[in-house]
């Protein structure tokens, strides 16, 4: 199996349908020798902030000298981003070797009357297999959706269960109330494990506290209100937390301080599990953390920023950041969304800050909302909206509309940010070549 064949196989598997529950992933991992049982995990669930929190925790653990596996969902640029050790993505060779083994087991499962595992179940099993093969000291694991019935929740060796910000998303699968969604997310907690949760909205907070109490878990609340002397910035942010003074992060967004506080509490909880993490590792890890597509600056003049905000909770955080960082700035949006998201709420929370909104259709996604349909929704509340036919056109038009000191903000779905990153890289390369000819 080569890489192209591997991708074709995964695409084909995506057409087989889904059976809820953990039976398929449990059987697949059993046939693989239950690699997850030989690993230790930090398991992260939440509506928003999972990826950034994973990045902070992983970076700190790496700085402390540990061999750290990372399992990420969704990817932004390239498939192999899903599975990483340290800063290295799984190689095409290892990916193909693992998938070849797993495919044989999947075929045998179907012959034995089991449902074929889904792409996410296969990827999760592949990650477990790979991390065991490479002898990771610890794995930082991000749920795909929810928690209780997520394929990642097969694990039983959780050191710390982490709950990032919980809000309304995936209601079709997780329920229509914050309590129901929180119950799914809190389902990653295992009896007696450490639980670290961000301070949640009251309804979700009650569920988290009740779950931890029922399972005999030690619960720590990471409350950003306890961060002192916070200095916000687009390129650097500093804060004090507990005994740590002047911690520094380079990820932008006021909400990133809350994610960093959560990560600090997680590594302190790991200390209670026997992991040795010095203050110098916490500082170095936080400072060196990078994460694609979270208020990420791609260009200075005009200021071109991409952000993965795609639901109500994330849109509220984005609006807060816009208000804080870009007061009195002229702002142009490039906005693309998926049909199953809370499109009306995202529009309501963000439209007032934009002078001009360009809508796009996220490419190669069956759930994509067409640019013209999104423009119709935006037009109900905002007069200056234009649907454009491609991401290339959106990038070019936004630059024609923007002055040197204006802001171009691209958001609405993580699914197309990788394309935007490549388009901007191509644009900058072309610009540098033109400068070189002068």
What do the predicted segments below correspond to?
Residues 362-365, 431-438:
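Short, flexible loop segments at boundaries between secondary-structure elements
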Residues 72, 198-199, 211-233, 249-254, ...:
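Beta-strand->loop->alpha-helix junctions that form or flank phosphate-binding loops
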Residues 198-220, 235, 303-306, 312, ...:
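C-terminal helical cap/extension that packs against the catalytic core
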Residues 29, 34-37, 63-156, 202:
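ATP-dependent carboxylate-amine ligase catalytic core
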């Amino acid at each position: 199996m080569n890489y192209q064949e591997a991708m074709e196989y995964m695409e084909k598997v995506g057409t087989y349908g889904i059976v809820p529950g953990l039976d398929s992933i449990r059987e697949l991992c059993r046939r693989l020798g239950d690699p997850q049982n030989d690993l230790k995990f930090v398991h992260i669930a939440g509506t928003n902030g999972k990826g950034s929190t994973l990045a902070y925790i992983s970076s700190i653990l790496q700085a402390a000298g540990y061999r750290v596996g990372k399992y990420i969902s969704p990817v932004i640029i390239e498939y192999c981003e899903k599975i990483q050790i340290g800063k290295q993505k799984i190689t095409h060779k290892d990916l193909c070797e693992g998938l070849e083994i797993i495919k044989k087991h999947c075929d045998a499962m179907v012959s034995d009357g089991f449902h074929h595992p889904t792409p996410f179940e296969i990827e999760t099993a592949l990650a477990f297999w790979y991390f065991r093969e490479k002898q990771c000291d610890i794995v930082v694991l991000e749920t795909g959706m929810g928690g209780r019935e997520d394929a990642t929740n097969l694990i039983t060796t959780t050191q710390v269960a982490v709950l990032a910000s919980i809000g309304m998303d995936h209601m079709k699968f997780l329920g229509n109330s914050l309590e129901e969604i929180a119950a799914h997310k809190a389902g990653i907690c295992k009896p007696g494990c450490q639980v670290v949760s961000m301070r949640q909205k009251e309804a979700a907070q009650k569920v988290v506290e009740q779950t931890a109490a029922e399972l005999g878990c030690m619960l720590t609340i990471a409350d950003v209100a306890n961060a002192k002397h916070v200095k916000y910035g687009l390129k650097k942010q500093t804060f004090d937390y507990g005994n740590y003074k002047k911690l520094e992060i380079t990820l932008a967004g006021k909400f990133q301080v809350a994610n960093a506080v959560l990560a600090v509490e997680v590594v302190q909880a790991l200390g209670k599990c026997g992991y040795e993490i010095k203050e110098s590792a916490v500082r170095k890890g936080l400072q060196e953390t990078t994460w694609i597509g979270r208020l990420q600056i791609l260009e200075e003049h005009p200021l071109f920023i991409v952000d993965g905000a795609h639901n109500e909770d994330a849109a509220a955080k984005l609006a807060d950041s816009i208000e804080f960082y870009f007061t009195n700035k002229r702002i142009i949006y490039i906005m693309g969304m998926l049909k199953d998201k809370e499109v009306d709420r995202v529009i309501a929370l963000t439209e007032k800050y934009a002078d001009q909104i360009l809508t796009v259709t996220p490419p190669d996604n069956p759930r994509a909302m067409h640019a013209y349909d999104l423009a119709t929704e935006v037009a109900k509340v905002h007069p200056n909206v234009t649907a454009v036919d491609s991401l290339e056109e959106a990038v070019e038009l936004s630059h024609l509309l923007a002055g040197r000191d204006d802001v171009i903000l691209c958001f609405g779905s993580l699914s197309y940010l990788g394309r935007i990153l490549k388009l901007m890289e191509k644009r900058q390369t072309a610009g540098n070549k033109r400068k070189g000819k002068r």
